[in-house]
């Protein structure tokens, strides 16, 4: 059984992560593909079997922790989700930042904290297309459209489906940037092709 820790310890732990400055993700980029391949071996149509398999390898596999945390979040077990995400983050899995940001954005098991959300996403925007996609909305809200489109393009090029859809909409009218129907159709065609989804690849669903 996964042992839960206190909220105060959680806050301190996350603060340490965020105060550590710009992380060097080079080592993680070397080991994470192998961890992902191992975690993918647990995928099964029998979801209980799949979760049990993740649980068995979670002590040494950050993607197993991430997916167990996501399952806990979907079942509204936010405290467990938070702890598992923190374990995965401590292990160097930067893909969990987006999920932590979601908890803080919605106040799931923690107090809402927009500053923490932005810091979590900014930390990994250059290595995690999902984080880049989510962060783009912050720049859209600030009307910094150049940065927003740059983030969306990075995400879309890496098959983050919602980013492809958003770019298609952006290029279909001149509200944000000049209309480019060719690009709009291009991104919509990629969005409609569901054969390769980056989010599904990372989250397992």
Where are these regions (language model features)?
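N-terminal leader/linker segments that initiate helical-solenoid repeat arrays
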Residues: 22-71
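Terminal, low-structured helical/coil segments at or just beyond the last alpha-helical repeat
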Residues: 178-205
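Hydrophobic face of amphipathic alpha-helices that form TPR/SEL1-like repeat modules
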Residues: 66-74, 97-106, 132-141, 166-173, ...
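Hydrophobic/aromatic packing residues within the alpha-helices of TPR/SEL1-like helical repeat arrays
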Residues: 53-54, 85, 121, 152, ...
């Amino acid at each position: 059984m996964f042992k839960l820790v206190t909220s105060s310890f959680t806050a301190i732990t996350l603060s340490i992560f965020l105060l550590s400055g710009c992380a060097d993700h080079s080592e993680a980029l070397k080991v994470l593909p192998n961890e992902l391949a191992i975690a993918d071996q647990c995928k099964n149509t029998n979801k209980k079997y799949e979760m049990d398999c993740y649980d068995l390898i979670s002590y040494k596999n950050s993607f197993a922790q991430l997916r167990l945390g996501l399952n806990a979040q979907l079942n509204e077990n936010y405290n467990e989700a938070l702890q598992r995400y923190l374990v995965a983050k401590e292990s160097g899995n930067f893909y969990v930042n987006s999920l932590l940001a979601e908890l803080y954005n919605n106040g799931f098991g923690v107090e809402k904290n927009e500053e923490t959300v932005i810091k979590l996403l900014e930390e990994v925007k250059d290595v995690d297309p999902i984080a880049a996609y989510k962060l783009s909305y912050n720049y859209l809200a600030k009307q910094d459209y150049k940065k927003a489109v740059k983030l969306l393009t990075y995400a879309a090029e890496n098959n983050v489906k919602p980013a492809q859809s958003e770019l298609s909409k952006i290029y279909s009218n001149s509200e944000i940037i000049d209309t480019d129907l060719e690009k709009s159709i291009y991104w919509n065609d990629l969005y409609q092709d569901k054969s390769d989804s980056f989010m599904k690849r990372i989250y397992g669903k």
